[in-house]
Amino acid sequence: MNQIEQKWQYIWQEEKAFEVSNASSKPKYYVLEMLPYPSGKIHVGHVRNYSIGDVIARFMTMQGFNVLHPMGWDAFGLPAENAAINNNSHPKKWTYSNIKNMKKQLKSMGFSYDWSREINSCDPEYYKHEQKFFLELYERNLAYQKESFVNWDPVDNTVLANEQVVDGRGWRSGAIVAKRYLKQWFLKITDYAEELLNEIQNLKEWPEAVRSMQEKWIGKSIGANFHFKIKDNEETTIEVFSTKPETIFGASFIGIAFNHPIIERLVSKTPEILAFITQCSHITRSSKLEKAEKEGVFTGLFVTHPFDSNIVLPVIITNFVLMDYGTGAIFGCPAHDECDHELAVKMNLSIKQVIKADMDVQKTAYTEDGILINSDFLNGLTSNEAKQEVIREFEKLGIGKRSVNYRLKDWGISRQRFWGCPIPMIHCEICGIVPVPYKDLPVTLPDDVNFDGHGNPLDHHPSWKHVNCPKCDKPAVRETDTFDTFFESSWYFMRYCNSNATEMTDKKACDYWLPVDKYIGGIEHAVMHLLYARFFTKVMNEQNYVSVQEPFKGLFTQGMVLHATYKDEHNNWLYPEEVVKKGNEFFHKESNNRVVQGRIEKMSKSKKNLIDLETMQEQYGADAIRLFVLSDSPPEKDLEWSASGIEGCSRFINKLEYMFKAIDSLKDDVNSEVNKELNRLVHFTIKHVAEDIKHFALNRAIARMRELSNSISAEISKDKIDVKTVRHGFNVLVQLLNPFIPHITEEIWQKLGNKERLYNLSFPAFDESMLELDTYIMAVQVNGKLRDTYEFKTSVSEDEIKQVTVSLPKVQKFLEGKEPKKIILVPRKIVNILV
């Protein structure tokens, strides 16, 4: 099998089979899988992702489209730098070596990529364009530097964006993330929050789950900002944001974030307060705060109520108010907010009901809207009426106003690591921050770097960071932070349209190819990569790089590939190939010691539940692997890897070769009876496989093709064979299977005597008239109960159906000589005789 696969891979390469032109009279179709990080080896999860995309690409080509199906490398990132530290070598060497190996693996799987458009994000010819783009953003005030609390990953020694913190831990390292105050570069994605939110509804071909995740991440809240005066210090106020300002008369405390500026100015930091602040510093907004126990510590400060100066409220540092949402301060209304209620019970704060409810708010918060009570001038109003009225009162008093808040914050793009795109800025003591002149781009990384594992090597490089200021020509230093790697992946799909363009994009090529018609990847990128790519597209549209407003017309999120985990007697993880099953138990192949089978989980290096792709290819071939990852589960669902599954796919491919030999040896028999049912099944399969592929029901398409192969095999085994229909059916089967298993189908197609390549052929056509059955079976009921069935010819009339069914012996038995009162027909399904 490997020889056949290598043969066709060579032919495709020599014939430039999958290279496409930007100038074509055909309609375009752009299918793209998320580009991989060059970690060294392609894993089975990659194969599933790319196999899905390859079926769509090959199918749409057969449908007459000019299909763009490119591949490239998301090549910057921490793993390369960590490998450099471990091996004392430059990450560039490690990365390029991995790219070479992974490209070879991808080609060995027969994926129909246009390699002439390959991009590599760590190539200066690629990242020089994004450096220029960053400078353009800086000129438009969409890029800026400021000091801010950031998420610091102590293992990777770098800053993480909010989206890269999962349950309080770094998304790569798993380390508990702390807060640090550092100078950082940001992009003003918040300027586009409303646009990004509103246009989610236009993404009709995206999964609802992803649209919902983006909507929640942007997190639009409509409410009011208003001020509380500090008691005994009325010149100082605390500004709060609230989505329910109408509950102001139920306020019993002010909650502030642990890093609110008022703490530095006015709060005496007792040991209790300091300990609580340290504890809170590990909280990020990505933590599951709603599940965390609500806690607080009193600051010693009080504020006065804006409508009644006799009411004073304590100011409390809480673990559920965060500085990066709203103003970093809220007023707590325990009767009508669950978090506030939990804290009030814990700290013995008052709980005052201000919305009418048929429940005891001392026990549980009532969070619905209703009629206001105990609220002075708001009494008797609905929640919405009260909200408008209280905001008008804030504005009249000059203490507040209506406001809109977003959960989304500006994108922090600074990373304190070496292996990334250098940020093209210079710091001068005289001139301040100075952009690198366009003519000096790209700013490239040095080759002579010492990796000692401590921070960013660019910080202590002897010469690279030292440069003269472009403005005053005095000594200055380069910015040593590098871009977050999501910067590169936010526009790479545009570069594929013409990867040799002298500018960032070839606008004419982008106008032809964009948006991407179908983008395929994991749902884990819903609020990082996919949101950033949408943001970049909107900005690049304004900069006249592209005409589209949205990058991806359709999105498909595939499921993960899972495998059982194994541990030895010392609790060490084992690779599947180290384990053998004997009966219902598992043992170590070498030691023969008992092995414990754990949960079936996502394949990961740490748990060693990986499948070595090269070993699988040697044993079964690329086609069998492709077929298995597509046939055993719907593509959007998780897939469990199984040895029996891949073996079954290998047997099916071998069966195709056997079928070819058997059919090739058949002689035409003019006396054989035409197999109408087989002919109907051929046309039925063509129609429904096409529909299945269009709807990404690839496992269902494979099941239909297996059914057709079984029917052809059954016909071959008969004494009298309809050779013509068998040959036609087998030719169709080979064509239908080609997008799924391209190597063996091209080989069989050639052996069948065909000159043209399958990849150049149109998808088989079906004849609608051939789908009609000559006969059909109807259920025959008496008074609604099934009594018999009968097969009718399609040409039979309703009167004939009634006559035949009434005269059936089994029906006569229940009629007992009586005449039917009524006969009800459901065409081609049921006859119900009423007596």
Curated annotation (Swiss-Prot):
What's its top-level EC category? Answer: ligase
NCBIfam families reported for this sequence: leuS_bact
**Per its UniProt record, what HAMAP family does this chain match?**
Leu_tRNA_synth_B
Query: Where primarily located?
Result: cytoplasm
Cellular compartment(s): Cytoplasm
Designated name of the protein: Leucine--tRNA ligase
User: Does Nucleotide-binding count among this protein's keywords?
Assistant: yes
Q: Where are the transmembrane segments?
A: none
Q: Which Gene3D superfamilies match?
A: 2.20.28.290, 3.10.20.590, HUPs, Isoleucyl-tRNA Synthetase, Domain 1
One GO cellular component term of this record is:
cytoplasm
Q: Which GO terms describe its molecular function?
A: aminoacyl-tRNA deacylase activity; ATP binding; leucine-tRNA ligase activity
Keywords tagged on the record: Aminoacyl-tRNA synthetase, ATP-binding, Cytoplasm, Ligase, Nucleotide-binding, Protein biosynthesis
Annotated PANTHER family: LEUCINE--TRNA LIGASE, MITOCHONDRIAL, LEUCYL-TRNA SYNTHETASE
- Which positions bind ATP? 605
Q: Which Pfam families match?
A: Anticodon_1, tRNA-synt_1, tRNA-synt_1_2, tRNA-synt_1g
Motif 'KMSKS' region: chain residues: 602-606
Q: Which PROSITE patterns match?
A: AA_TRNA_LIGASE_I
Q: Which reaction does it catalyse?
A: tRNA(Leu) + L-leucine + ATP = L-leucyl-tRNA(Leu) + AMP + diphosphate
Tell me a GO biological process for this protein: leucyl-tRNA aminoacylation
Q: Which Enzyme Commission number(s) are on file for it?
A: 6.1.1.4
Q: Where is this motif: 'HIGH' region?
A: 36-46
**Family statement:** Belongs to the class-I aminoacyl-tRNA synthetase family.
